[in-house]
Design a protein with these regions (language model features):
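Short, acidic/polar
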Residues: 33-47, 97-100, 179-190, 250-251, ...
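An alpha-helical appendage that flanks or caps ligand/catalytic pockets
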Residues: 2-7, 127-166, 207-335, 371-374
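Glycine-enriched alpha-helix->loop->beta-strand junction motifs that scaffold or abut catalytic
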Residues: 51, 76-79, 108-110, 191-199, ...
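N-terminal beta1-alpha1-beta2 module of alpha/beta enzyme domains
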Residues: 1-81, 172-173, 371-374
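Active-site mouth loops of central-metabolism enzymes
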Residues: 11-38, 85-94, 169-181, 238-241, ...
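Hydrophobic faces of well-ordered beta-strands that scaffold small-molecule active sites
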Residues: 9-16, 55-57, 81-85, 112-116, ...
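Alpha-helix-loop-beta-strand connector modules within alpha/beta enzyme cores
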Residues: 64-87, 140, 144, 221-223, ...
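Conserved, mostly hydrophobic/aromatic
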Residues: 51, 73, 104, 141, ...
Length: 374
């Protein structure tokens, strides 16, 4: 068996982004047009062989239960990190969240990262937790992992007696929260030692990331926390050397799923300086008539959103995603690193489609290191 390449510490990957099907249709189209849970497991194997740091799986209640898919990936790999990206903190009792992390660590080694968020009721992810409840959930899970037995009645609910009789004997998993990094969430991160990092969503531009990073650093300064103790991860859609049509499905159509909901769109307006009028026209597209504010993502597969996506300026997509040649993509990823991101997570495309990109990214790092030494 050939040796695995060195891990690229600042590059991870999402697997089977968005909606999936239980099996491929007779004519699946592009590689990313339709994906299955089984392909997600293989994507994880490919990610390890290519040297990605870890893979993230975004939970969906239909066919993307994270414990199943991440467990399958961990069983077929030896060092690859596996992470939820994200699960709604309110969709599971904290004991179950703690059990998920402890079990994966015990079964496959200390490779799990728990990514949690406040919730998205439209996706069936439970209620929309307050920031206080989210912070308490993270703290509760860390306390359970440490072996504590305790009572809890607070913002996260009246949970009664908590604690695991058998725990993982080693360092606990890290916890990151999925949010935009605006002042309120930045304060939650800074004031909650149990939170180790933030996962910023796809479609933020380098400008948007730099603003989120500034909010987090300022909040840490006010809270007396070392800003360096908060790892900043960002999802970046990547489409290296792919056809224009597949690129539009990966980037433009997926952007609709983030920008159509007003509650998310406003955050992009603030961080990216994007025109609210453009996003309002997107929400008023005839294809969305009658969905009454429900997420377009729940009514249409991404390939069905290419039409509405034409309302989005191409420059917005070029600013927020890595497209074109491999070197074009490398330059774009570097912009996100320069904006303050510690780790980039490729999104929308498969690890295999990013094989040349991770190789070029590794070469860039090695060349920079050689210059520094010389």
């Amino acid at each position: 068996m050939s040796a695995l390449p060195a891990v690229v510490d600042d590059l991870s990957a999402f697997v089977i982004s968005g909606r999936v099907k239980s099996r491929l249709p007779a004519e699946p189209g592009f590689e990313t047009s339709v994906r299955t849970p089984a392909q997600g497991v293989q994507d994880g194997v490919d990610a390890e062989l290519l040297g990605f740091r870890r893979v993230f799986l975004a939970e969906r209640p239909e066919l993307k239960e994270p414990g199943v898919i991440l467990g399958g990936i961990a069983a077929r790999t030896s060092r690859l990190g596996v992470a939820t990206g994200i699960v709604a903190a309110g969709s599971r009792h904290p004991m179950l969240l703690a059990s998920l992390g402890a079990t994966i660590h015990a079964a496959y080694g200390p490779r799990f990262t728990l990514g949690v968020g406040r919730g998205a009721p439209a996706y069936g992810h439970g209620g929309h937790q307050s920031y206080e409840a989210l912070a308490d959930t993270c703290t509760i899970v860390k306390r359970i992992w440490s072996g504590e037995q305790f009572e809890y009645d607070g913002p996260a609910g009246n949970l009664g007696r908590l604690g695991l009789k058998d725990i993982y004997e080693g360092d606990p998993p890290e916890i990151v929260i999925g949010c935009f990094g605006l002042p309120r969430s930045a304060r939650t991160i800074a004031e909650t030692p149990a939170i180790d990092g933030i996962l910023l969503p796809a479609m933020l531009t380098p400008l948007g990331v730099s603003r989120a990073v500034a909010h987090i650093r300022q909040a840490c300064d006010r809270a007396g926390r070392d800003p360096g103790s908060v790892r900043i991860l960002v999802e970046v859609p990547t489409a290296p050397e792919l056809s224009e049509e597949e690129t539009r499905q990966i980037v433009h159509a997926r952007a609709v799923t983030y920008l159509q909901p007003a509650v998310w769109g406003r955050s992009y307006e603030v961080l990216n300086d994007w025109d609210p009028a453009v996003l309002q026209r997107l929400r008023e597209h005839p294809q969305f008539t009658g969905i009454d504010g429900v997420l377009a993502d729940l009514n249409f597969h991404r390939v069905q959103l290419v039409g509405p996506s034409r309302l989005l300026p191409d420059q917005w997509m070029a600013d927020a995603a890595a497209m074109g040649s491999v070197q074009d993509c490398v330059r774009k990823l570097q912009e996100f690193r320069d904006a303050g991101a510690d780790e980039i997570c490729t999104y929308g495309s498969t690890p295999g489609q990013n094989a040349k990109l991770i190789a070029a990214w590794r070469e860039r790092a090695e060349a920079s290191a050689a210059v520094a030494v010389g």
